[in-house]
Structure formats: structure tokens, C-alpha cells
Amino acid sequence: MRVKDPTKALPEKAKRSKRPTVPHDEDSSDDIAVGLTCQHVSHAISVNHVKRAIAENLWSVCSECLKERRFYDGQLVLTSDIWLCLKCGFQGCGKNSESQHSLKHFKSSRTEPHCIIINLSTWIIWCYECDEKLSTHCNKKVLAQIVDFLQKHASKTQTSAFSRIMKLCEEKCETDEIQKGGKCRNLSVRGITNLGNTCFFNAVMQNLAQTYTLTDLMNEIKESSTKLKIFPSSDSQLDPLVVELSRPGPLTSALFLFLHSMKETEKGPLSPKVLFNQLCQKAPRFKDFQQQDSQELLHYLLDAVRTEETKRIQASILKAFNNPTTKTADDETRKKVKAYGKEGVKMNFIDRIFIGELTSTVMCEECANISTVKDPFIDISLPIIEERVSKPLLWGRMNKYRSLRETDHDRYSGNVTIENIHQPRAAKKHSSSKDKSQLIHDRKCIRKLSSGETVTYQKNENLEMNGDSLMFASLMNSESRLNESPTDDSEKEASHSESNVDADSEPSESESASKQTGLFRSSSGSGVQPDGPLYPLSAGKLLYTKETDSGDKEMAEAISELRLSSTVTGDQDFDRENQPLNISNNLCFLEGKHLRSYSPQNAFQTLSQSYITTSKECSIQSCLYQFTSMELLMGNNKLLCENCTKNKQKYQEETSFAEKKVEGVYTNARKQLLISAVPAVLILHLKRFHQAGLSLRKVNRHVDFPLMLDLAPFCSATCKNASVGDKVLYGLYGIVEHSGSMREGHYTAYVKVRTPSRKLSEHNTKKKNVPGLKAADNESAGQWVHVSDTYLQVVPESRALSAQAYLLFYERVL
């Protein structure tokens, strides 16, 4: 008798239906990497029927919605969540839409199943019968073949489909405009081809393409031999210097070409291959075409462009002085180079558009001395407050802080929070040793603040420079050393900078040598991104370093470091030379002045009255209110007050003959973050991705964001480009939305096509106040367009405001 092989005993159907059990994340629907083997694939897919259907119909448009021709606010309403039936080629809106035409199509009575559909934006395959997502790797080849065909067809037919959709919009628009006596405007929006999981890049670039101030300023520097006039500070008593700039760097040139090409909307979707390849040379982490984080991409891009521009300005200043060296330059030349360089590096277009400033104010409760730290930011990361029921605190813990909060309630207005009291136990338990050491380091930095210090922003010690940068730094160092004492050197060498790379993440190629830090980090927030390494940043984290009163040293700080950070790597045109630099080699982007004249009553004053939140409110204003609320530094977070320590030491010396050194005096303190310089373009980042213990999760709660945002309640009274009592208004013009889960999602953009603000453009390009800027432009409302890679759709304003925003782009209008 023949015995069967036990490995072949199971029927083939049972083998296919078996799939691994993987725990689901609470916010993720795509944790199963291997996918599902579906038994309906054989009967629910017809390649010939699909090819015939898509040739006869519009691409990525719900045919039923198109038949209904529904208009809202004069615009054709068409959803971007389109699913295609792989049996007959029917295209319908998804189950999350109002009409649910795709689901209705499946439920219609038929002899053959129409249960397998594919999303034409994210390319997710779904089976209604199995109620599961399918994978092309675990099913028959026909599934992979039809997906490949549809993706190729999408890149070819996107332009014609959009033009036919726009004709329907224009027909309706022309009818309405004839009745109103107006004209219909052409939309200056162009789709961007997806190179392979590059939706995170496309969404950001759509918003930058609608940043009109960026294109205006780039037009000034696009050509070689461009003249730049540098005005030194009045203290230097030097005449303005006109320098001739060389050609822009390769990434800057690629960015200019890309933004210029985005205006040519009649040519169809644009391939960003040239710009993306240039960025990958600077940041190799993007080479693998994996899903990345849009905020991180934005930081890398602006950081790299700014580095090229500052090097360009630096080289032009050295050329104006016949390229001096440390041996040939005299003291007078060094002083001039520093004076012109200090103002010259600030004239790059990235700083003029995107950079703002945060001021952290710390006040000792005992001696009432105040210290400030000024920190530049490229965006502000705002935590999203979730609706969770908090556990009741023990009476002992309640009473511990009640007296202080009650006694100080009448003295200081505004929301007061106690730092590091309600941290989840899970987060404490699973935090890495590096996170703990970083937290200890940050606390020590905060405690080292005192009233007698001026503190400024310090950056990475390992800086990459080319030949001109090294020569520039050498000139600065040789001059600074003449005025530095050995004590100053020892203090500066004791300063350490922060690394944003988590211990669990693996740095890529050239990034492993020097990790990311630099100016263009978020002003707060966990930089946790989906499908990428984790970059946890604590709220309001600042870097501190002591600054002496030497004017030469301050100038050296302003010019020495023209290489922002080591994130920009892989550039073969520059020498890779990383040196540990002391404080005189670090860039002081904005002049940080210690506020000695502040009284305790005025230390935390804002431009206007504090914003009043409502119950259960979740909006940009409430997030900003939470971000700028006052904190109490107490318990383990007490401030090491050097002024109190100094007074105690003095008292001991007067009352005792012993010369024993007094231990540091720790006191309760108040701390608050406020905006002290507002940028022309404000970028807000909503922290939707979090690490809870060992798991990752996404916060899907909707955050309300206004079309017009008043930033005055969150600005300090000493805000550099605003006055007390004035409004600081910003208009919304761009949104980056993330849909999906932590492990698999899709980035899209909402952009507002509008008339450029003439007053704002003149104000930003000329760097001076323009008469009439006090009054907001009386502009037209503009038109919102939803862009998903190459797919474009005109949407009503209400649709844009209902988006699950991840990044928000605001431009200043008042």
C-alpha cells in the first residue's frame, strides 16, 4: 500500500486560506505585511473588461457623481477617493464618501462577483467579500499584472482626464460669470508624477509652488553675476558693500527650475526627477523610494538650499577682499569680513521667508531674576490634545502643588501647567537610555540659566565645510582668539549640541558620520514619522550656551558657521571636513539679548490678550495656547539659579572665614515659550504620529484650523516685527494631509490659488516696511484645489477645512 507524503496531505485550498496572525495597531489597518490569499481572485478579475472600460470613461472619476453633475459653491463636486472594480472597470467613490457608489455597485445583484476593487490614489486592493486588504505577492499573477497595467495607464491619461473635468467646471463657471458679469480664472496648478512612494515629496512641493514669496525671491538670485548689496550694522561704521554672487548651487538651481516649470500648467504633470535626485545627493536617506515623512523632507530641503546660499554669499564676500588667508589678512580685514558676513548670511531667501524666533523666558521664584533663550524655528510643532479620561490624583499629590498654584493665580495670568507630573507610566518604562540621558542633559541646561547670562542658540559641533568655509572660519577664529581668555575657551568647549537621531534608528550612509541637528528642526514635538526612523524631540527643547560680552566674539558667531548641519551630505563638490568647533564657530542666527530690564509683571506679557479656549476645543488656537502656556519648574525640574547661588556664596563668605564652595541653589521657577519674531510664511506641524511605549500610533482627531489666524496672543510684547495691540494676521494657503495609518498612508495637498499680495511681496523682497502693510489686502477669496500626485480636483472651501491636516502653510497678510 502506498503511503502519501504528509506534507501533501493538506488540500491546496486550505494552504491558501492559511495566513499568519499579526496583532493590529489600534490606528493601523495595514499591519499584515504578507497580505491575504483571496479565493475570489479567479472569478472577480477580468483584464479585458477593465481595459475596455477605462478606455471609454474618464480616469479616476466616479461615473455616477459625474452623471449627477452636482455643484457646490459654483464648483463641480468630485471626490478623490475613487475605487475601480477589477471585474468590469466601474469607477466609483469609496465607502467613506457621501454617495458610496463603489459599495452600491458591489451590492447590486449579479451572477458574477464584483467584490475586488483597487484605490486609484493609494493602489490599495480590497475584497468586499473577505473584508480584507489584498497583496499582489500572495495571489495569482493576474492581480499583479492588472495593477501594473493600471499604474502605467494612470501616468498616461491623467492630463486628458483632468482637462475634460475642467471643461465641465468651466461650463458651469462661464454660465455663472455671464450672469454676474465677471470672468473665469485659470487655475495655475500642475500635477506632479509619483516616482515611487514620493507622495510625501509631492505634497510639500505643491505647497511650495504656491508660496509666491519664494518664487519672487528666487528670481532675484537665479542668475550668475547677481549683485548683492550688504548693509553692515551702524556700530561698525562701514559703508555698504556690493558683492557679485556666483552661480547658485545645484539643488537651488533645480528648485528654481522646478518652481518655474510648475507654472506651465498646459504641459500636463511634471516629473520632479531632477530636483528629487539632487536632494537625494544631499540626503541619501530618500534614495530608496520608501515612504517618508513630509515634515522631515521639508526640513532637509530647506536646510540644504540654505547651506548652498550661505556658502555662495560667503564666497562672494571673500572674493571682494581678494580671498584673504589667515596669513595675509590683517586685523582690519578680519573685522570687515566679520561685519559684512554677519549681515550677509541673513540675506539668504530661506531666512527671509521661513525663519521665525521663539523666546523661552525663565524666572526664578525666589530672586525674580529673568533669563531668556532665543531659538530660531522653521516650523512650530503642536501636540494634539486627545479626549482621554485622566486618572484621579492622590490627595497627597494634589495638596503638594495646590498652595503654589492658588497663591500665584492672582499674580500671573494665563494657563499654568506643572511640568513632568502626568507622564504615562508606559512611556517612562519603555523609554530608551539615550532618551533618559538626553532628558537629564536638557534639565541641566535649563538650570544653568541665570540672570547674569546671555544665552544663544548653539548648533552641531560637527560641521561640514568647503574650502571657503574653512578659510572664513579661520579668519574668524584667528581674530576671536586675540580677545578670548583661557577661561572663556574652557567654558565654550564644555558646551555640547543635541543630536536628533534616535538610538534605535539606523543612519544612512554619510549621515552615520554626523547626525542630524541644525537650525531647521521643529520648534518642538516628536518628529516621529510613519514608515521611517523616529526622531523624538521634546516640546520647547532649547540648546543653551554662555556668551561673553566680547563684540568681536559675537560677530564671529554670526559669520563663522555657514554650513548649517551635517544633514546635507553627499555633495561631491565640497570637501568633507568635520571639525569640533567651539562657540566662536557657531552661527548666532538672531541676536539674543538678555532682558535685564524686565519686571516680573512684564516678563510674560503678550502682544494682545490671551486666547480663551472653550470646553473640548481642538483647534490650532487651542494647540498654540497649550504650546505657549506657562510651566512651573518644580520638584525634579527645579532651576539651578546661579544668582541665588552667588548670593548664598557671598553671604557665607561674609559670615564665615571658611572658603568652602557653596552647593548650587535649586529654586522653583516659571517658564514660558512665546514667539518673538514672526516669519513671512508660517508653517505649523500637527504631531499626529506618536510613540507610546514600544508601539506607534497615529492621532486621527480632527483639528480645526482657521482661514485667518491671529498670532498676536502667542507673541511676546517685544516681538521684533509687530507692535503691542496690533494684530498679526496670517492667511491659510496650503495644507498637507496624511490619510491612512502609521505603516501605510498617502500624502495629498490642498492649495489655494489666489492673487499674490503685492504689499506682502514688496515688504519681503525689499526687507523694509511698505506703506499700507498695516491694512490687510482686499483680495479675492481664491480657489481651493485638491492635489494627489497627478490628480487635481477643484474643491469647495469647506472640503479643504475638513482635511486631516498634517502641515499648514500660512502667509502673513497683516
UniProtKB/Swiss-Prot annotation:
GO terms for biological process: cell migration; DNA repair; global genome nucleotide-excision repair; neural retina development; photoreceptor cell maintenance; protein deubiquitination; proteolysis. InterPro entries: Papain-like_cys_pep_sf, Peptidase_C19_UCH, Ub_carboxyl-term_hydrolase, USP_CS, USP_dom, Znf_RING/FYVE/PHD, Znf_UBP. SUPFAM superfamilies: Cysteine proteinases (SSF54001), RING/U-box (SSF57850). The modification Phosphoserine is found at residues 28-29, 508, 526. Residues 1-62 are annotated as: Interaction with ERCC1. Residues 1-14, 432-443 have a biased composition (Basic and acidic residues). Pfam families: UCH, zf-UBP. A zinc finger (UBP-type) spans 36-153. The active site is at residues 199, 746. Interacts with ERCC1. The catalytically active form interacts with SPDL1. Belongs to the peptidase C19 family. This is Ubiquitin carboxyl-terminal hydrolase 45. It comes from Homo sapiens (Human).
